[in-house]
Amino acid sequence: MNGLVKNGNVEKPNKYFDIKDKRDFLYHFGFGVDTLDIPAVFGDTKFVCTGGSPGRFKLYAEWFAKEANIPCSENLSRSDRFVIYKTGPVCWINHGMGTPSLSIMLVESFKLMHHAGVKNPTFIRLGTSGGVGVPPGTVVVSTEAMNAELGDTYVQIIAGKRIERPTQLDAALREALCEVGKEKSIPVETGKTMCADDFYEGQMRLDGYFCDYEEEDKYAFLRKLNALGVRNIEMESTCFASFTCRAGFQSAIVCVTLLNRMDGDQVQIAKEQYIEYEERPFRLVTAYIRKQTGI
């Protein structure tokens, strides 16, 4: 199951993939190699930017196209599961919420890059998160991803067996993104990101329908996370870090905090402030991309 990137090309770690390569259909994207000229459409891709919301990523693609003065494609996905927009060398693909949805998107994105003949794509996740001891509006560039058991692995159950895989992220890319953040006066911190399995109990919220723990249990857990170097909580980081590492792709996770979980559970900020916070990961990442590509 393990594979490496060789000679800068996207290589397939699945030995059975070649059998169906010529007729491969990316089901959740709604197109395949015999229904779309994938190399013509995606062959110049250098960056794949991904995040949860389809609406947000449509906006991100449109904003980037306007800023860079380049065309923005229509939604290239032919499925209602995900959206795909392309602006020059950048693909914008949403992944939904949680690791199951993300894992589907990543596998089909990796296959898409293979079919397109792309060399050395960089994957960046842009998202929102809950802060752990950092103020709202802080952009956390993750050093590593931690699972709900507080281990630095992504856990998969395959054929009834527990498989653990590393959750490494690219240090050079992280440092470069942080440098751009300083240049743009965007509040940036680095630290670990905890990947919860759900939004409510898994993140020790007190405002869900179920709650079998006490308020002090919540704060004790958050203090423990903070002491371990965790700076934010979301629901995708372990899968994202593990899959991109396993595939041999440079990757980063850039998430803005919408609240400090030490102060509460609900996002209670004005709409204008919320929008400005959501723009911060976009501003940081696109400034880096434009610096790298010259567009």
From Swiss-Prot:
<dbReference type="GO" id="GO:0004850">
    <property type="term" value="F:uridine phosphorylase activity"/>
</dbReference>
<feature type="binding site">
    <location>
        <position position="205"/>
    </location>
    <ligand>
        <name>substrate</name>
    </ligand>
</feature>
<comment type="similarity">
    <text>Belongs to the PNP/UDP phosphorylase family.</text>
</comment>
<feature type="binding site">
    <location>
        <position position="203"/>
    </location>
    <ligand>
        <name>substrate</name>
    </ligand>
</feature>
<dbReference type="GO" id="GO:0006218">
    <property type="term" value="P:uridine catabolic process"/>
</dbReference>
<dbReference type="GO" id="GO:0046108">
    <property type="term" value="P:uridine metabolic process"/>
</dbReference>
<feature type="binding site">
    <location>
        <position position="81"/>
    </location>
    <ligand>
        <name>phosphate</name>
    </ligand>
</feature>
<keyword id="KW-0665">Pyrimidine biosynthesis</keyword>
<dbReference type="GO" id="GO:0009166">
    <property type="term" value="P:nucleotide catabolic process"/>
</dbReference>
<protein>
    <recommendedName>
        <fullName>Uridine and thymidine phosphorylase</fullName>
        <ecNumber>2.4.2.2</ecNumber>
    </recommendedName>
</protein>
<dbReference type="GO" id="GO:0046104">
    <property type="term" value="P:thymidine metabolic process"/>
</dbReference>
<dbReference type="GO" id="GO:0047847">
    <property type="term" value="F:deoxyuridine phosphorylase activity"/>
</dbReference>
<dbReference type="GO" id="GO:0005829">
    <property type="term" value="C:cytosol"/>
</dbReference>
<dbReference type="InterPro" id="IPR000845">
    <property type="entry name" value="Nucleoside_phosphorylase_d"/>
</dbReference>
<comment type="function">
    <text>Catalyzes the reversible phosphorylytic cleavage of uridine and thymidine to uracil and ribose-phosphate or thymine and deoxyribose-1-phosphate. The produced molecules are then utilized as carbon and energy sources or in the rescue of pyrimidine bases for nucleotide synthesis. Required for normal lifespan.</text>
</comment>
<keyword id="KW-0328">Glycosyltransferase</keyword>
<dbReference type="Pfam" id="PF01048">
    <property type="entry name" value="PNP_UDP_1"/>
</dbReference>
<dbReference type="InterPro" id="IPR035994">
    <property type="entry name" value="Nucleoside_phosphorylase_sf"/>
</dbReference>
<dbReference type="GO" id="GO:0044206">
    <property type="term" value="P:UMP salvage"/>
</dbReference>
<dbReference type="GO" id="GO:0019860">
    <property type="term" value="P:uracil metabolic process"/>
</dbReference>
<feature type="binding site">
    <location>
        <begin position="125"/>
        <end position="128"/>
    </location>
    <ligand>
        <name>phosphate</name>
    </ligand>
</feature>
<comment type="pathway">
    <text>Pyrimidine metabolism; dTMP biosynthesis via salvage pathway; dTMP from thymine: step 1/2.</text>
</comment>
<dbReference type="GO" id="GO:0009032">
    <property type="term" value="F:thymidine phosphorylase activity"/>
</dbReference>
<dbReference type="InterPro" id="IPR010059">
    <property type="entry name" value="Uridine_phosphorylase_euk"/>
</dbReference>
<dbReference type="GO" id="GO:0006212">
    <property type="term" value="P:uracil catabolic process"/>
</dbReference>
<keyword id="KW-0808">Transferase</keyword>
<comment type="pathway">
    <text>Pyrimidine metabolism; UMP biosynthesis via salvage pathway; uracil from uridine (phosphorylase route): step 1/1.</text>
</comment>
